[in-house]
Amino acid sequence: MDLGALLDELESGDQELVQKSLAEYNQENSQCFFFNAEQREERKKLGELVISFLNRDLQPSCQIACLETIRILSRDKYALSPFTGRSAIQTLAQYAGLDYSEEMEMPCIPDGESAVEALKGLCNIIYNSVEAQEVAKDLRLVCGLARRLKLYNETRSSHESKFFDLRLLFLLTALSVDMRRQLAQELRGVSLLTDALESTLALKWSDIYEVVTDHLAPPLGKEETERVMEILKALFNITFDISRREVDEEEAALYRHLAAILRHCLLRQSDGEDRTEEFHGHTVNLLVNLPLMCLDVLLTPKVEQGSVEYMGMNMDTVEVLLQFLHRRLDRGHKLREMLTPVLNLLTESSRVHRETRKFLRAKVLPPLRDVKNRPEVGNTLRNKLVRLMTHVDTDVKHCAAEFLFVLCKENVSRFVKYTGYGNAAGLLAARGLLAGGRGEGCYSEDDDTDTEEYREAKANINPVTGRVEEKQPNPMDGMTEEQKEYEAMKLVNMFDKLSREQIIQPMGVTSDGRLGPLDEAAQKMLQRQESSDLDSDSD
């Protein structure tokens, strides 16, 4: 469809002709997501005419054609100016049924194709334009969406209508701090979205914080999964700072209720492995945000036939999280995005729940038998996590090390035993534990159990590599004392030269257990020695 001819027809104002021409243009460009720069001004002009045309009294078919055109044009972030002004956003909000006023007693519940197309256009525009985000805030679109969400269970709206309501809510709260705060505080968004989540999943409760989970139920349908994931994403946006502040009893009850629903989500499958993985990924992301004190509900359900039991506790959820970690480790891409949430969740849960820590330790760090290979060599979960401890991404490296350190109850010697000093050095240096000892966590005093294989090989294990090394011949065998002294001085001079030319900087462990320049470390040791000598003299 020639853009020039289309513009002429729009300017003519003939509704039937406009509808026919726009329908043809929409069909030709339905799969167009990249636009050439040459016709940008013509597309802007088309956008202005279409948004203006929508303010007329139009037949439904013409409304739909205009809104479809806006959806297509709004994919081009360089030609959005016709749609980002207050008037244009307000027009689209009216078609979507989101125009908000305090006097409005009931929200508009549109369910036609026009409303869905308007929502799609708004999603594109809000996503691509900061100006549009500000207008959406001024027009209180979040309030309109929240009002509609309150009737989520009572309306028979189509899947598309509900889905794009939720998608728009996610985008508004992701892109605007003010709208995020408004939904969370003024509109009680956590409660609102939790109710929508519960409704979509059609939950039944056996106890206050225990959902009835039918393990023989069919997988969650595609449409329900899509809506659930949008709800989880919106909840993530408005809860990301909760774990950093104190919550009162009412809030704690709300978050425990939500955690119980998220437990159910982890135990449900969706239609296909990839969709289930995505569904569980959003669930894990949200669980990380919740206060740790509220995650006890993950372990409270009664042990039933087929449940994973440990120390009398139901470990179904922890087992699912462990399998989820396995799969993400094997994928090996986008490690920060894929791994850090689940590693953080397992780490913090292990800190506060003894049963979780002991169960995970039995799975991840079973009694050590393989002392011939380096800790990072192999395909066990321990091997894969130890490999991550020297990853180039600092966040990934830290999360993997912290998880294993907590499973070792923050005991340095135990941590080194399972990972090797070379792999452990980064975390120990950051924690000031290079000289040994243990971290600040409070743990029970049960002992580590050494296998017979480990006890027999312990004396020959190289603590740096974490394995038994073959004995190497002593390079000084056969040397006279003069030759040894000569080689030693030669080595000292080489290090001295490298140090003076600032090619290397010799480091040592300081009194606070961290790495520091060797001269500083030596100076502090000398000062301590002098202080000790003075104390001895005074006696």
UniProtKB/Swiss-Prot annotation:
Parts forming coiled coils: none
Pfam families: Ric8 (PF10165)
Gene Ontology biological process terms, A to Z: G protein-coupled receptor signaling pathway
Keywords for this protein: Chaperone, Cytoplasm, Guanine-nucleotide releasing factor
Highest taxon listed in the record's lineage: Eukaryota
Region ranges (Disordered): 506-539
Gene3D superfamilies: Leucine-rich Repeat Variant
Primary localisation category: cytoplasm
Cell compartments where the protein resides: Cytoplasm, Cell cortex; Cytoplasm
InterPro entries: ARM-like (IPR011989), ARM-type_fold (IPR016024), Chaperone_Ric-8_A/B (IPR008376), Gua_nucleotide_exch_fac_Ric8 (IPR019318)
One cellular component (GO) term of this entry: plasma membrane
UniProt keyword annotation of Cytoplasm present: yes
GO molecular function: G-protein alpha-subunit binding; guanyl-nucleotide exchange factor activity; protein folding chaperone
Family: Belongs to the synembryn family.
Described purpose of this protein according to its UniProt entry: Chaperone that specifically binds and folds nascent G alpha proteins prior to G protein heterotrimer formation, promoting their stability and activity: folds GNAI1, GNAO1, GNA13 and GNAQ. Does not fold G(s) G-alpha proteins GNAS nor GNAL. Also acts as a guanine nucleotide exchange factor (GEF) for G alpha proteins by stimulating exchange of bound GDP for free GTP.
Descriptive protein name: Chaperone Ric-8A
Annotated source species: Xenopus laevis
